Amino acid sequence: MSNMNTLDLKITNGRIVDGTGSPWYRGDVGIRGDRIVAIGDLSSTPAASTIDAQNRFVAPGFIDLLGWSQTTAIEYPQLEPKVRQGVTTEVAGEGTSPGPNRSDNLRAGERWATLGDFLDELDRRGAAINFAMLMGASNPREIVIGDMNRVPTAEEMREMERITDQAMREGAIGIGSSLIYVPAMYSTTEELIAISKVAAKYGGVYFSHIRDEGAKIDSALDEAFRIGREARIPVNVWHLKIGGRLYWGRMPEILAKIQAARAEGIDASANVYPYAASSTGLSTLAPDWAMEGGYDDFQKRLKNPEDRAKIAEALRAQVARRGDKGIYVTQIYGSPELDRYEKKYIEDIARDMNTTADEALMALFAQSMPSPRVIYFSISEDDVRTALQAPWISIGSDGGSPTPKQREENVAIHPRATGTFPRVLGHYAREEKLFTIEEAVRRMTSQAAARANLRDRGLLREGHVADIVVFDPDTIIDKSTFEDPHQPPVGVTDVVVNGTPVLRGGAMTGKLPGRSIRGAGYAGKRQQ
C-alpha cells in the first residue's frame, strides 16, 4: 500500500450531496490522510479501505452550531449520541467556556485556567468529533467582577479586553454570550461591544443567547444588531424562538427584522433546534435582581419575607406565560426527598405539595443545589416551521452528548441531544417537505461552517477536510422523545472525522480522531 496513488479510504457508489444545496449526483470520494483528494469515478483507484455507500447519501459531516459536549468529551470522548446523528464538529461556548477562569475557581475536568489549556488537553486526549470553542462572554466578567450587578470600571474593562485577546490568540473562534444567566445578564451592551471588538480584530464571530425571547425579543435583537454594527463582527442568534403563548405567531415579524438588519449590511443570522420546547435551569424564571450574587444568594433571598413575596409574584407571571403543562421538571440536585418530583409537571408537583405553583417552585429552589433542570413547553410548532424555512437559518442542537451512565439511569433530558439532525432531515425535509434534503444538508454544513468561520470544512470538495457522513435518505429519522429521550436515531451508517471512520456500518470504531479547531487568531501552530 505504499503506492502514492493509493487512497487511505474510498467511499464508493454514493449519491453525493456536496453541501452547496445542489442536487445529488453519483460518484466516489477519495481520502488520503485527513483530506479529500478526489471526487468522481474512482473505480480504478486502489484504496486501503472502502465504504460502499450504495443507495445512500454521502455528505459533509454535520456542524452543530450549539453543543454542550465539550467537557463531556474529556470523560467520555466517544460521544456516541452525537456521532450517530452525523455530527462531526460541535461549536460550544454559550455564555461560559471551560476557560479562562480564576485560579481559585478551577475544577478538574470542568474548568481550566485558560481556554488554551482546555483545547490542548482536548487535543492530547482526542475525541470522536471536533470542537470549535467560543470564549464565553461570562468568563472575563466573572474573573474580574464576579457575580455582582455593576458596570466595570475603565481598568476592569481593560482587563476583560486583555483576557479576551488572550483567548482569541489561544484559539477561540469568537465570543459566545448567554444574557439570561448570571453574571452575563448584568453585562452592558457597551461591555459586549468592547470584547467583541477584540474578537473581531482576529476574525472572530459573536454568537448570542439574546436577553429575551418573548415580550422583549425586539429590543434583544436590536442589542445583538448594535453589537454587530459597532464591533464590525458577524452575529448569530442562538436557538431563535418565540417563548410564551402570548407571543406565538410573531416569527414572520422576527425573521423580517433580522432580514432588515442583513439588508442594512449587518452580517446577521440565526440557528434553531427542531423542537417546540426548550430546556434550561429553573432559575431562569427568577427575576434578575433576585439572582445577583449567584444561586446561593438567591436561596438566601427566599428566606426574606419581603423578597420572597416579590419573587412569588414574578414566578406567578412566568407560570401564566407558559400555560398549563408548560413546565416539566427533569432533574433535581442534592435533595433525595425531592427526587419523586423529577419527570413531573409543576402543576402536578404543586398538587402533591398541596400548594400553589409559585410556592412549589420556591420549595424546589430552596432545596436543590444547583437549580433544578426543566423543559419549557412554551414554543409554537408553527413558529418552529416558519423559522426553519428562512434560508439563512442553520441548526444548533443546544444539547450535550449524554453519557452511557445517563442513558443507563434514564436521566431525563431534552431529545434534541440525541435527535436534532436526523429530525431535520427525516421529519422536516423528507416528510414535511419544508425544503429538500440537499438544502437541509447545506444548512448543517457549508452554511454552518461559514457562520463559525471554519475553513476547509462543510463541503465535499478536493482539498477540504474529510469530515463526512453517509446516511439513508429514505430512513433517516429521530427516535428520541420527551418520554424516552435516549433512543438513538436511525439512518446514519458511517461517519468519518478528519479522514478516520468513527462509525462504520452502524458500529462505533472506538477511534478518536477529533481535535480542536482553532480560530484565525491562534498564535501557535496553525490547525485546520
Language-model segments: residues:
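Histidine-rich, glycine-flanked metal-binding segment
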Residues: S2-L9, I16-G61, Y76, D478
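Divalent metal-coordination and catalytic microenvironments
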Residues: G14, V29, D34, N55, ...
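Acidic, glycine-enriched loop/beta-strand segments at the rims
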Residues: I16-D28, P372-I379, D383-V384, E432-V441, ...
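Metal-associated gating/positioning segment near the N- to mid-region
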Residues: S44-T45, T50-D117
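Short, acidic/polar
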Residues: I74-L79, E156-Q166, A220
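Active-site neighborhoods of metal-dependent hydrolases
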Residues: L122, A128-A154, M160-Y181, S196, ...
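Divalent metal-binding pocket/active-site signature
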Residues: Q166-E223
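C-terminal cap of metal-dependent C-N hydrolases
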Residues: N304, T386-W392, S397-D398, I413, ...
